[in-house]
Each structure stands twice: as structure tokens, then as C-alpha cells.
Amino acid sequence: MGVQGLWKLLECSGRPINPGTLEGKILAVDISIWLNQAVKGARDRQGNAIQNAHLLTLFHRLCKLLFFRIRPIFVFDGEAPLLKRQTLAKRRQRTDKASNDARKTNEKLLRTFLKRQAIKAALSGNKQSNEELPSFSQVPRKETEDLYILPPLEDNENNSSEEEEEREWEERMNQKQRLQEDFFANPSSVDIESEEFKSLPPEVKHEILTDMKDFTKRRRTLFEAMPEDSSDFSQYQLKGLLKKNDLNKCIDNVRKELNQQYSGEVQAQFESEGGFLKEVETRRLVSEDDSHYILIKGIQSKQEEKKVDSPPQSITFNSSQTPKTYLDLKLASAHKTKPLQTSSAEAAPPSPRTLFAIQEAMAESWDHEKHEKPSVSGCEAEGNVSPRTLQAIYQVLAEDEAGESNKIKVVLQSDEERKPKTKVLVISSSDEEDDCLNYQDGTKTTLGASLIKSISPSSMQCQESTADSLPNYTRSKPVSQIEEPMADHNLQGDNCNVPNAKDKLIVPPSLGNVDKPIILSNTIPVNSEFRIPLLPVNMSMRETVIIPNNTGSLGSSRYISLERDATKQGFSDNPVGDLVRSPDEPALNASSALSDRKTSATQSLLCNNIECTEQSMVQGCSNTLDVTQTTQPSGGSEVNKPAEYNPQDKKVFGSNDSSAMYVPMTPESIIVSDEEFVNEKEDSDSDDSFIEVDSEFSTSNSQHVVFKEPGDTRETATNFQAVEEGNSGSQDIPLEHDSGEPHEQSNSEESKDLDDVSNEWQDISVEELESLENNLYVQQTSLQAQQQQQERIAATVTGQMCLESQELLQLFGIPYIVAPMEAEAQCAILDLTDQTSGTITDDSDIWLFGARHVYKNFFSQNKHVEYYQYADIHNQLGLDRSKLINLAYLLGSDYTEGIPTVGYVSAMEILNEFPGQGLEPLVKFKEWWSEAQKDKKMRPNPNDTKVKKKLRLLDLQQSFPNPAVASAYLKPVVDESKSAFSWGRPDLEQIREFCESRFGWYRLKTDEVLLPVLKQLNAQQTQLRIDSFFRLEQHEAAGLKSQRLRRAVTCMKRKERDVEAEEVEAAVAVMERECTNQRKGQKTNTKSQGTKRRKPTECSQEDQDPGGGFIGIELKTLSSKAYSSDGSSSDAEDLPSGLIDKQSQSGIVGRQKASNKVESSSSSDDEDRTVMVTAKPVFQGKKTKSKTMKETVKRK
């Protein structure tokens, strides 16, 4: 990894290089980073790891190096240092935690997205599609096109049509131009009421009319003279106003025509799916020619509108018609759905479950069929519940897939204002009258009493009720009209497809026609192989539904008595269990809706012969529906009086709780609440919301069926109890448990769980299958990506990989070494000892170990090979090895974690703010930060720079800076051996065998890669190339893009020069003092010897040349005089030569310091420095010459 962000900082100092110029050079290669890249990054097109990716990567890169005739030395990593192990462990732990959090977040987002999509799909409802139904065995998925598939050629017809359109457009424009010219010439010449104008396209008409409007608004007075009489001016204004009004009307009509033209396709599309009663109005919202927005309000299907407006219809059938049964229903469904899928299912006939799914998907077309049938009442569309919505219902219900013979149709309908739900038992009617009844023994029956509900006038008699739960006053009443508002369906809210109209079950008030009984039978088709046998019942079995009217404290009540007599059908006396529902039991509770699945007792939904009876409830008819009304007078006496028929009487389901929900009774259904209905399924021919379940009954003798009757002023809820007499020999578990039967409830829950698991895929629609497949595909893709990411993170370089790589290097004849510790440190020491010409690596740690030449991006196909030198880095950025180590402290590396939120720019600013050598800048920074944290609550120092104000917010560790990090970089454990390396020639045969065993390559493929490399190696080059004689073109150094970084580098380099100048100046001052003391000693020695020679006066420091002489006035004078012929020099040699060198250097440094104060520092200052020259050779020569010149000076 290296130092974070260091390559970004050093990129300005790198320059591109041609790999061909590296021929013959010895380069060290850090193979450890190759192995990590191969293990973590090498993937195939599907994202899976490639087998032996490390060997394949090494093979190709070796071929590239040998092709350029480069002599590589590979270096393997040894044992990781302690600091590196600690840092990598912490980093890996932090990365894993972040990865886990990211995966959890992605899962939450995915679940949220899927829930939203499911809700949207549920709200959108079913839409008719003209596409063929896909096969259930394989749902087609959109495949990616082949890269090499060419686009189809354009047809000549398309070209001709485009030319025709262009021609028509030109004609329109010419016509428009002519009309405009005529109008401008004479405004009255354009007649907007003419047929010629009306035949124009709406776009042209709109432009002409708008031009006319603008023209008449501005230039009317040019063509119409003002009235001379002031009294006629009002007429003039009124005339213009009328013309303007006509023009505006015409413009509005044209705009409507344009809107109709734009929205015609949308309107046609929706009309084909049912149509809209309201118009689609479009308006332009933005100034874009290609954009058009359509706002559709009040969407309502024409079928639904017709159903809402249609009056209640009487349910009357001729007795000669064949009644509908629950038997052979799926066979009828198969016949019904065959025309819909002949094109897609000719090869193999679909299974019954497939027919169910297809029938659910074509719900819209079935609604259309119901609309055309006269016997369907006005509110058939109540069941327009989307399959996705019903799927949510299925999750709380269970379905027995095997071994169950009785399937009961249940429809879930709830109220708009109430949220609780309830399961309901449905008896519906339809138009299929061709089905016959199949009993358990296989016999068939014709039109019989079990399917006919007859109402005779003689049955409308008063009867006495002796039940304890009934009120005292009882009167007989026919089933007249049951009406209930629709409920708000779950998951749909305001956008549900269920219409808001009230559902009605109408019995004609006229009961004189006894020969036309009412046939109420479910005719939802099912397959013949799933036949529903009728249930043998007891002769005395009776179901009574009591409907009290709670409008007052002592109000009237009604009850519906369902009696069943099985004597005429020849049934056995097997009992039927009871359904129990408590008033406070929650509706649609999955845990309470189960009964034992092992019992064979099922309830027949066929109420045979609904008839109002007088005294006896069992007289010749199998099943009778009695409607009686009981009231209790204030006196408490029991009075019987006949109830007059009221066609507006309403009966609804509910409980005696005022907050209970409404359960509607549809024209095709008599709905009875039942908590034991489970495993429902959407399957309908005339109602889309039918749910098919298996119902079994418990051992309880009482059935609580909840009704609700709305009063005149407010809605009230009452409790009803249906008493069913019969044998209680069944072992089913009742839904209403006592406190002493906890085990029965647990058994019920366990059996339901088993049913949920076994029948999860029992019935599913086409849309659900497609959605499920898409969701699974997305989930699979996500899991694959997650698995690949986890494998990439967990992948590590093993020792076996290193051994295999070394084996391949031996086959190619390439030398390699195993470093004691870090491979980068070993490569750096090879560079420092001139054993290599550089290192091929992408790890920036190598600079901290002292490398001088680095080649980066050598094997990157999208980038040039970059060459970096330590000298360029030092000259352009002012960074040396110690500063690079300090950057590692701040940015983070394999040895230290760094400071959070500190990048390479901020790190350079820190080094600029705190200059120094070694770790001194970091120590100063830590001390300043500690003081700043102590005074954090106080006002900040106004003298602090902007950088320091930002640095106050950083968080430093207590151990910062750790000296062990710098020691690890400055003194790494390396092999300092300087033994020579040797290279061999590749063994072709061994390499072929290696590639065949590891890569599975054939001999031909190996030769295609390897033979060009061997040919290049064998090429003998005796003549030198021209680039060996001429220096290559110099690459211009890239500038620093960041202004902050540029400022920090400039200031840091200036500070370094100032520090160096101060050090040199201090050294020069010390040297000058030593020189002065030495001169004084020499002068004293000369006087003591009695010489008369007089020394020239020393000039002061101010008299010297501002450029800085070498050692004073004597040397300055001698440099301006000619030398004597004998070449003798002055006695300057009496001064030590080292002193002369130091003073000459001090003079040069003084000139540089003076120049630096005038000019601004830049990165090029180091190149303009004056080369220091030693003055010693200038004064070497014979002593006689020097003495002669001195005597000449004295005489003068």
C-alpha cells in the first residue's frame, strides 16, 4: 500500500519514459505487490476468481520484461515487521466493520425498495396485455446483445417515407408563408371560417392565429380608420372586442385539437383497456418541444361506471335451466382459458395450477365478460383485487394441497372506513349452466332441491321461536335485500381497484311466481380432477343466523335460519362440525383460523332450497334459508305477527362491538364469517377476488356468525349466534377455546405452519411468478457480488503461491532473492549500492527506504510508464528522506495509521508551519497542539495562521510521533550482500509443460506467446543506436495544480535556504575571528624580527567589494596587477589554504544571500546557484614574483 496519497503528491516530479530505452538495464522488481494484485484483482467476466491467477500474471509480465531486453531481479517479501503487523490488523478490523455496516445498509435499502415496488404493483391493479403468456418452466429474461451484432440496414421504404414527410412539411411551410404574406398585405383577406383554413394542420393554424392576434393588437388603426364621430367610438371598440373574442375562441379550439392529437395515443390505449369517461387534457408545462406532460384526473372504468349506475337486478332463473354446481368447476375453467392461451401452450397442455395462474392474470378480460352477461348484478367489479394484493392475504392463510376433496370459495371483503379484516364464506352465482353435480360415489344429479332456493307464498307465515337466544316477538320475513358498503381492502387504501358502490343481493318482492326459484350456486370453474364432493349431513342439522336490531335498548331482531335436510339426497349421517367465532376475536387472525387437517369432514357450500317456512324447518327440502324478524315489546310478552316485506331491509355482518367492520354481501355471494377457512387462493370466473380454501369444522356445537345491520341514523354492531344441531363426533379443534384447552390451540398452530410450508407454491399467478423470478434474479446477483467482495477481502498470498512463482522464475532463468523483511527495503538497498538501475514497483514506501530511481505503472495498459528520481523530488518539492518519513506519520502507511482527515496538502502545510530536521517538526507540532487543546475554550491566538486554526481541530494520538516508525524506515533489516547476479535462458520445453499443467494451454497457444519473446532475446545487436549518442529530449516538469500546495512548497523551500544561509554566515563569522587573531600574531612576529617592511593598511569591512572578496584588500590588489616574469607570488601562501577556501566560500554565500533577498524563491533557485571555486591555485607560484610585486606596490 505505501504512504497514502504520496504518489498524488509526487506525480508532478515524474516523467513518462519509453520502455524500449531500458534495454540492458538491471531493474529490481517487487513481486509481492504483483501477487496481491493477482489474488485480489484478477477476475473473469462473471467476476469470479481465476485459477492460478498469480502464475498467469507473472507469466505475462515476465514476457513483457524479456521482450524489452530488461534484466529483472525479483524480490520476495520476508517476515513482516512487528509495526506493520499491528497496523495491518487494525486496518483490516476497521475495514471489515465498515464492510459489514455497508452490507446491512444495502440490505435495508433493498428490502425497502422491494416493499415499495410491491405496494405500487398492488395499487396499480391488473391490466390487460396483448402479449403472449410466457412459459412457466422458464420466464424469459432480457439478454445482453452480442458486441459484434451489426445494426440492421435501413429499408428503402423508411427512406421514402422520410422523404415524403419532408416534402409535406415543406408544402405546409410554403402554404403558411403565403397566408402570412396575404394577411400582412390585407388582414381581411384571411377568413378563419373558410374550409381552406380549417383544412390546414393544427400547428399551422395556431401560428397563423397567434400572428393575427398580435398583428391586430398593434396595427389595427392602419387598416381600419377611426370613427369621426365620437359617439361611434364605442361601437368601434365593441367591434374590435368581438373580433378578438372570435379569434381567441378559434385559438382555443386549435389548442384543444393539438392536445387531442398529442394525447390521442394515450386515450386510445386506455380505451382499449376499459376506457375513461372523462377526457384526457394535456397542456404544455415546460418550454421543450420533445416534452409533453399529461394530467389525468378522475380515472374510472366505463364498466365500473355502468355497474354503479345500473339498478339492482332480480336474480331469477328458469327452472328448466341447468343449475350451477361446485363440481367439475376446474374443467370449466380449463375450457374458458383455453382460447386465451392457444398460441402459447399448444405443445404441452397446462396443469390445473397453471390454469389457475393464467385465469388470475387475465382478470381484466373476465371482468369484460361479466359486463356482457345479463344475469350479473351491477357491482361485479368489487373483486378487482390485484394478484399482488391477494398474495398478501395468502400469507396469513394456508392451503392443503394434497388429500383434500372439498374446496370452498371464500372472498375477503372489508369496509372503506374499517381496517380489520375477516374471512368470509361465499356462495355465488354465475352464467355457466352446463356443469353437473358429481357426488362422492361418482353419480350425477340433475336439477334438484340441493341447488334450488325457492321461496313460496305459503312459507311467508308466522312461526313461534322457542330458542333462548331469540327475542320473544318473532315474525317471518323473506330474504329481500342485503346490502353492505364495500370495505377498504388491505394494502390498497384510496387507490384500490374495488369500487365504492354498495353490493346488493336482491330477491324480487313479488313471490307469486313459485315456479321460478332462485338458484344461488357457485360457478367458479375448476378442473375436473379436483372435484368437490357434497358433504353428508345429519337430517336435523340446522344453521340459524340471528340478526338482532340494536337501534334501541329493546329493539327488534332478525335471524336467518339455514336448515339442511339430507334425507332426500341419500347422504350418510356423518356430522358436520361447527364454526365458532367470539365477538372479541380479531378478524383475519392466522393463528385462530386453523382446524385439524386430518379429518375428512368438510362443509358443503350449497344451500339447497332457500325457503321461508312456517313451523317445521325440515319439510321436503334439503337446505332451507329462513329469514325471521323477532322483536320484544316492552311488556315482555311473546307476540307473533307477520312481517311486511320491505325491499330496503339490509343485513350485514359484524359483531356487537360498535367498532366492528362491515362485511359486504355481494349480488353473487352470501357471506358468512368463518375463522376456520385457511389456505385461500384467487380463482374466479365472475369475481376476481374469490379465494379457494379447505374448510373443516371443530367439535363445538355452536356457530357464532357475526352480522351487522346499519341503522337509520348511525351504524350499530350486533352479535349473532347460529346454532347448529348435529353430532359432535368430529375431532376437529374449535376456534374458540376455553382456558382449559391450551394444547388444542398449540396443535392448531402447528398444523397451520405445516400447511404454510407445504402449500407455499400451490397457486401462484403469472405476474407473481414473473415478479418472483425477477426478485430472485436480483437477489442472486446481489449475493454473487457480495460473495465476490468477501472472497476478495479474505484472499491472501500464501507460501504455496510464492513457491510456484519461484518455480516459474527458474524456468525463465530469472534470478530472485527473498528479503529478510520488506521487499521494498531490499530493492532500495540494491539501488543505493548501484547493483540495480532502479526498481519497478507501485509501492510508495520505497522512497522512505532510500530509493533513488523508481519506475511506476510499468504494466498498466491505460497509462504511460512513469520514471521518478529522488533528485527531482528534492528539487521540485523540497522533500528529502526525513520529510518523506514525516509525511508517513501524517498520512499513514503500513507502519503507522496517520492522522484522520489529513491529506497530502495539509501534511505539506504542517511541515511548512513547523520546520526542522528529522522528527523535530512533528515534535513541535505535537507540543503546539497539546497547548492549543488546553486553551481550547479560550479565544484563539490572533497571530495564528489559517493553517494553525484548522490544525486545532485534529485528533492526535498520545504516542504521536512514535520514534520506532522512523527507525524502521531508516534502519530496515536487509541483505547487504554485493554478490553478482546471473541470468539464464528460458527453457522452452519446461515452460510448455508448466503452462499445460497450470493453465491448461496447448502447445500452440504457449508458442504464440513465448516465441516472439525468444526471438527478441536472440536478436544480436552490434551497432549502437542513435539515442546512445544524443541525450533524449527533456520532459518539462509538471506544475503544482493546488494553490495551497504550491504556497506550502515555496515557503518551505525559502525557509530551508534561509536556515542554510544563517548556518553558513555563522560559520563565516567564526572563521573571520580566527583569521583576525592569526593576522595579529603574524604582525607581532614581524616587528620582533626588526624588519622595516610595512604592511598595507587593512580595509574595513565596509570598504570591501559588495560582491564579497576572498580574503581582503591584499588579494583584491594583487588580482588587478600583472604578474612578474619570474612568476613569484605574494606571501599569501603564509595564510593557511583551508582558511582561504572557507573565506572564499563565505563570500560566495554572502552574494547568494543578497540576491535571495531581492528575488522571490522558486523551485528553480537551486539550479541558478553560483558554483564555488577555490582560490588556492590562483596564488600558487614562486616567492620572488610575489615579493617583486609587493615592492612595486610600496614604491608607488
Curated annotation (Swiss-Prot):
Name assigned to this protein: DNA excision repair protein ERCC-5 homolog
Biased composition (Polar residues): 311-321, 722-731, 1142-1158
Motif window: Nuclear localization signal 1: 1079-1095
Biased segments, Basic and acidic residues type: 734-755
Biased composition (Acidic residues): 154-168
Region (DNA-binding): 31-67, 853-869, 881-913, 945-951
Bias (Low complexity) ranges: 1119-1130
Region (I-domain): 819-914
Sequence segments annotated as region (Disordered): 152-176, 302-321, 629-661, 722-758, 1075-1196
Location of the region described as Spacer region in the Swiss-Prot/TrEMBL record: 79-818
Function of the protein: Single-stranded structure-specific DNA endonuclease involved in DNA excision repair. Makes the 3'incision in DNA nucleotide excision repair (NER). Binds and bends DNA repair bubble substrate and breaks base stacking at the single-strand/double-strand DNA junction of the DNA bubble. Plays a role in base excision repair (BER) by promoting the binding of DNA glycosylase to its substrate and increasing DNA glycosylase catalytic activity that removes oxidized pyrimidines from DNA.
Protein family (similarity comment): Belongs to the XPG/RAD2 endonuclease family. XPG subfamily.
A Pfam family reported for this protein in Swiss-Prot or TrEMBL: XPG_N
GO molecular function: DNA endonuclease activity; metal ion binding; single-stranded DNA binding
Positions bound to Mg(2+) 2: D843, D845, D894
One BP annotation, GO: nucleotide-excision repair
Ranges where the record places region N-domain: 1-78
